[in-house]
């Protein structure tokens, strides 16, 4: 490895001469030659492109990749933190010093099985990178929300100008703190125009289903009705509408069930309430459709959907 200084001058501070040395071995005298030494001013190490601190400042960067900077309330966004480093240095250890608290967001850390080195291009330069953290966020406040910087302590090996006995490059280990930039999210409120009174904050794309485990039974029996919402959106952040039944049917508090997967793109799956219902008298009883309202951010509008109407036949009383 070689480096040159362009436009630099060496100023001679002094000149020294090392005189002859002699030694007598078995009657023979051996003499060394004189050596002239020029002492110059020290060249600042910061000018050297192989100085570890110079390499770190130029070739190490922590970036935060944000999927969307202007979402609606309760619309999912992702933030992925990547450590970029030059191919000429080796990262040997990483630790998180400071992390954002993601205030005013519902947040979920998306697990990374293991750190893997990949290649990318950033600002016209080639880098290695590791993905350090993935976060799924749902903004809970309209307006500007700041995501504070993340800071990592990075231990790296950088090449020096020195080589070992076998000609291999000698590396120098250094530790450096690197931070991402602050991220500003501008959250849009829900539109007030045509906003239904029944809207309770559900955002995404959903369907609603109602299903009874019995359509005909005796008055001394019970049956169950499951009211289920499926789709993609903020499934963990809203309530299922209540099931309305005729007054002659005794309805008990529902059992809630959640089957939701959380990934970098958001939540998807289903949530449901299962009601146990006991009839009091003989007859046919309609269980009316249940209305559910959600906001679709892609279509930028509110959508009303209905579950099926159910009819239960009580054959004796």
Question: Language-model features: where?
Answer:
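Surface-exposed interaction/ligand-binding surfaces
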Residues: 8-9, 13-317
